[in-house]
Amino acid sequence: MRAVGVGGSPRADLRHTIDSLTSQPEFRNAHWGVLIVNPRTGDTLYSKNAGKLFMPASNMKIITSAAALALLGPDYTYKTTFLADGPVGDSLLDGNLLVIGRGDPTISDNMRGLATVVMDSLADSVRAHGIRQVSGALARVGNAFPDSTHGYGWEWDDLGEYYGSGVDELIFNEGMAPTTLRPPPDSVRDSLYSGPAKDPGTGYLNAFNDALTRKQILVEAGVMDSILPTPIKMDTLFTYTSPPMRNILPALMKPSQNQIAEILLKTIGLERGGMGTADSARKIVGQQLLSWGVQPDGFIIRDGSGLSRHDLLTPETIVKVLDKMQADTAFAVFYNAMPIAGVDGTLKDRMKGTPAEGNVRAKTGSISAARSLSGYVTTADGERLIFSILANNWSTPSSAVTGVADQIAAALAAYRTH
């Protein structure tokens, strides 16, 4: 449906356009929440169910990313420590090679091009300490993220998918692991697939052990599946520092990467609450939202990514956070991490050929019966607007819901405030 203005003021025409789009007969049973504001003037250009709670899907990542910038900062880095619990001499580490992680999510193909290259560099660092053989095992020490590796309320159907893999203080390739499927005897070759690792921490150690093998370093006892109790004596070999938060957020926001979001949530709990659990983090993020002026009944946080159907946000909450981020010293990091309509990320193929292309910076969201689009748009006369569009529970094809959100965003890009 093409919405047509009624010939009144620009604001009246905009309201008519959005009302027409969201009240089409096919959306008779759908729930829409829309809020559009001009942050410079404080004007509300459009509001529909803006104070109602909706499943936000991946718009929850707006909250997680904003809180991470506010509470951890754009220069925050993750540190992974590599240690020995025995002496090193004559090329032998007479003991275990230990790893203490704190959640570094950056050793992945998505962030580094080829994650094994990073692992090889870590193995080179072990080799630089004169180690060619480890008499014991490769093991992890510490338990920075002691709760479940999956988010609260994640559905069973999601857990076997790439976007539903778990996270831990050690994680390689976003918790994915290669899996070889053996074919029938008459087939030519095996098939190699990638699926969620049963245990992300062990998956990391397996990948690191593979790198050690490539560098001709033998770990005699292999990988220890369980967490090793902290030895009385350990010597630090080296510490690996991740790229900073300013580099991590685009890898989270543009492709809508669930595992990075969950790690950031737990990191907030670890760094600001002393406990790397989702429960600890939810309280801290909630306090941050309240400090920004969000209404206490405007949010329910259950995970960091929005994959949980127990997450609830209002359009008012999202717009408030987007507005507050404009005053943050790291706003450029936040703004540039968002997908750009028609250009990249989850918006690469949307709004092409419209005034929104190359203009709208917004976070998408998509789970069953929930679609969302919230962010920033610059109008035809140069005003930056903030908008949030949430939709839940419809029976029409989901593409129709996404299409309405895109049409609203395009209308905002073409809008003239006066």
Annotate each PLM feature.
Residues L14, L45-S47, L265, G269-H418:
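Small-residue-rich helix-loop
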Residues R2-S9, S47-P56, D85, G103-G113, ...:
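Second-shell loop/turn segments in exported
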Residues H31-W32, D90-I171, G175, G269-T317:
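Mid-domain, small-residue-enriched loop/turn segments at the edges of structured enzyme/sensor domains
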Residues T179-V333:
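A small/polar active-site loop signature that marks catalytic segments
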Residues N29-H31, N49-G51, A57-M60, D75-T77, ...:
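Extracytoplasmic
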Residues G42, P56-P74, L138, L170, ...:
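Active-site SXXK
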